[in-house]
A protein has these predicted regions:
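S-adenosyl-L-methionine-dependent methyltransferase catalytic core, i.e., the SAM/SAH-binding region
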Residues: 1-146
Length: 146
């Protein structure tokens, strides 16, 4: 969906409220490619769910709270299912903030609240994905509080 498509959606919304799933589908259907319609609609509904439930704010709050509730040596294990979540979690675990910028002390030493337990993200095996197709997008990250 390009910016002109989005502006058309916004203008249409100004004239007619979106009150049902049918209204929403009618509005976005012209922008879905026939071969990618299912994927496009899944992403659109995922975006709606994330926004309506304020999931990114909730994830940020939870991660920030771990700094107070975890004792040194305590482990934080997080499974993410899409790139927005994963980027937040990855940056937070590696740097202690959501932007991914490391804090340094007076001497230039990087200050991070966590140590990554695994250097690489853990993803499901081919066998797991075959048994459970919904696991295909899952990423597991483990960090230990310093």
């Amino acid at each position: 969906v390009c910016s002109s498509d989005l502006s058309l959606i916004v203008r249409t919304r100004e004239n007619k409220k979106i009150e049902t799933i049918g209204d929403f589908l009618e509005l976005v259907k012209p922008f879905t490619g026939k071969d990618k319609e299912k994927k496009f609609l899944a992403q659109a509904f995922q975006a709606l769910r994330i926004e309506v439930n304020d999931e990114m704010r909730a994830l940020k709050e939870m991660l920030q709270q771990t700094l107070q509730v975890l004792k040194p040596g305590g482990r934080l294990v997080v499974i993410t299912y899409h790139s927005l979540e994963d980027r937040l979690v990855k940056n937070f675990l590696k740097t202690g903030n959501f932007e991914g910028k490391s804090e340094q002390d007076f001497f230039g030493n990087v200050q991070t609240p966590f140590r990554m337990v695994n250097n690489k993200v853990i993803v499901p095996s081919d066998e797991e994905i075959e048994r459970n197709p919904r696991s295909r997008s899952a990423k597991l990250r483990i960090a230990e509080k310093k």
